[in-house]
């Protein structure tokens, strides 16, 4: 049996190491300035043949909820194709068309 097919359940997408997403937390960009923000790079897990679109969603920075949200440390590790509903609003997310 092929080792790859034995460890990757059909429900999971295959990881393409050549496709990566650079994420800059809005908190870092606001506090340190955009030029000083350190982007984090995550692998994107795709279904073969998927087309990608990049979108940015963010909270209203004038609201108290947004300020509290920004001050909360967030750690995200992408393990599947993400949608805006599955990641915090301050992150750039990738969706399949």
Swiss-Prot record:
It is a peripheral membrane protein. It is found in: Host cytoplasmic vesicle membrane; Host cytoplasm. InterPro entries: Protein_9b_Betacoronavirus, Protein_9b_SARS. Keywords: Host cytoplasm, Host cytoplasmic vesicle, Host membrane, Membrane. PROSITE patterns: SARS_9B. SUPFAM superfamilies: SARS ORF9b-like. It holds the Pfam family bCoV_lipid_BD. Its main location: host cell. GO terms for cellular component: host cell cytoplasmic vesicle membrane; membrane. It comes from the Viruses. Residues 8-97 form the 9b domain. Homodimer. The gene encoding this protein is included within the N gene (alternative ORF). Bat coronavirus 279/2005 is highly similar to SARS-CoV (SARS-like). This is Protein 9b. It comes from Bat coronavirus 279/2005 (BtCoV).
């Amino acid at each position: 049996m092929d080792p790859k097919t034995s460890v990757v359940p059909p429900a999971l997408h295959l990881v393409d190491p050549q496709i990566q997403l650079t994420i800059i937390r809005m908190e870092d960009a606001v506090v340190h300035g955009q030029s000083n923000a350190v982007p984090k790079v995550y692998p994107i897990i795709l279904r073969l043949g998927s087309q990608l679109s990049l979108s940015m969603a963010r909270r209203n920075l004038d609201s108290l909820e947004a300020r509290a949200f920004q001050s909360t440390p967030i750690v995200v590790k992408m393990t599947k194709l993400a949608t805006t509903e599955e990641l915090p609003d301050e992150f750039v997310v990738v969706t399949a068309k």
